[in-house]
Amino acid sequence: MLTQIINGHILTPQGWMKDGSVLISDGKILEVTNSDLAVIGAKVVDAKGMSIVPGFVAMNIHGGGGFDFSECTEEAFHGAVAAHQKHGATTIFPTVLAPEIGVIDKAVAVCEEMMRKKDGPILGLHIEGPYLNPKMAASLFIDKENPADPKEYKEILERTDCIKRWDSSPEIPGCLLYTSPSPRDQRGTRM
């Protein structure tokens, strides 16, 4: 279905545009034009002078709407995602605080299930921990130093593609090996 949004302030890479329109089909922007002439066959939506902006990418989001991604349940993921979508996020990288490897395993299972859904907003996980310096972890509630175990993290990275970012402290034993180039890094994980 073709939708045309008119009568709004449109944010483009060149700046703000007034008196234009945005054409959308199947949830994707087809065109931004400086004309607000009606497109035949399109459903017209009047923005009533409001701002029209691209969807937001949420890259460091721990939860929302009363839900926390670290709960590692489908209910928590759905609830937090819905809260952020309501406010304009179209792409989400759930951030999971992982004081132990078991939390990562649970988060990966939920994330992989949600990523299987066509046109879903989740594009991968952002993991914080367990290889963080407790003195530098701010409000992350990491209470002990966990040396990075190559067997542990390589096994996780070899079985999933959903981890896109994994935070660690380089001063923790084993973390420099953990961040060295590997085949997994080339598949999309930022360490």
What does each model-found stretch correspond to?
Residues 133-160:
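Conserved phosphate-binding/catalytic loop of the ribokinase/pfkB sugar-kinase fold
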Residues 62, 78-107, 121-134, 160-171:
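Divalent metal-dependent hydrolysis catalytic cores, especially in the metallo-beta-lactamase
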Residues 172-177:
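N-terminal active-site wall of soluble small-molecule enzyme domains
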Residues 81, 108-112, 153:
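Generic structural signal for well-ordered alpha-helices
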Residues 178-185:
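Conserved small/polar residues in nucleotide/adenosyl-binding loops
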Residues 8, 22, 27, 49, ...:
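Divalent metal-coordination and catalytic microenvironments
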